[in-house]
């Protein structure tokens, strides 16, 4: 390592861990990462450009100052590519200094760009805080955990604007998306462990994904216990997760390492679930096909869940949840009809029993009959009445009220429907029903 740097010391000892973390950031989609030489080149170049602050140690405050000055520099046409590399490397070092873990150089640039976009909003917020705390330190690493003049720190709740912005990103891009990870990594550097976990729990998202995230956090906790035996100066899992602490206690300086570990665990869990979601054979992507029976769908789903590297309780939860949410529409309706309100908690066996007839010929005929069944006419009009006589049960063209039978002379029916005609088939037609014809003649002689 060259003998040049802050305060003329060998290298940059204050950035030893930061450079080590920065070397894990990928340059692009491949496996190539930044090297220690890349970081030293960027730092030495910046010290050469801005000689007025060369002797100052590389704190986060100096990085912000250099970043603002670097934006005002206009590079020559032949050195634009090197200038872009210089900015990108500085962005990665700044993210590592703030405790963030971006996967790629582009992600680091996105985090710094997002911070620039929020700079105007932060200025108004800082003015209000400075009015309340005139002796507030300029270093903003742990804000809103504010350092007080009398000693100690005070805790400030997460603002509603920040919470709503995180909610919007989670709804638009997903709970385990890279956009949500960047937003959370930016804001959560100033939160307590309790703040981080509470905000994550209140975010919108798939319940199965939340269970997987919780499972990954439990795995990180178990790994911490194995690698760090209990001791006087060893953090416990409860301290890291903020269990049994008030916000005031969690905001103190002795909990800084616990907050950083909690945020690191959450970021690791989000990335693990995201990689799991995009991996072939992911159970959450297995859905029932149109021509597939429910039994075949369940067989594929259970096989995929059993191969997942998660704990048994999470596997059980995924089986119960995905067996309903990933089923076809017909099966979901059938389960709702049979199981009712307990459909979400019902076992896989109960759901298979409820859907055993879905897809059969009898089930298809039942659906067809329901579709062809005429709707019941129920309304204010009621039963239709005859416009001629006003009575219900027939139309005006079928009304018999004004009809006279030409056989019996009675009203209400036609001659073809006359019962008297049917009962006496030998009766004469025409006027014979009136009796014998009277022939006029003179009276008898007395």
Curated annotation (Swiss-Prot):
Q: Name one GO cellular component term.
A: viral capsid
Where on this chain are zinc fingers (CCHC-type) annotated?
A: 384-401, 403-420
Listed A to Z, the keywords are: Capsid protein, Host-virus interaction, Metal-binding, Repeat, Viral budding, Viral budding via the host ESCRT complexes, Viral release from host cell, Virion, Zinc, Zinc-finger
Q: Which SMART domains match?
A: ZnF_C2HC
- Residue spans of biased composition, Polar residues class: 423-432
In this chain, the stretch annotated as Disordered covers: 415-446
Q: Name one GO biological process term.
A: viral budding via host ESCRT complex
A Gene Ontology MF term for this entry? nucleic acid binding
Q: What is known of its domains?
A: Late-budding domains (L domains) are short sequence motifs essential for viral particle budding. They recruit proteins of the host ESCRT machinery (Endosomal Sorting Complex Required for Transport) or ESCRT-associated proteins. Nucleocapsid protein p14 contains one L domain: a PTAP/PSAP motif, which interacts with the UEV domain of TSG101.
Would you tell me the protein name for this molecule? Gag polyprotein
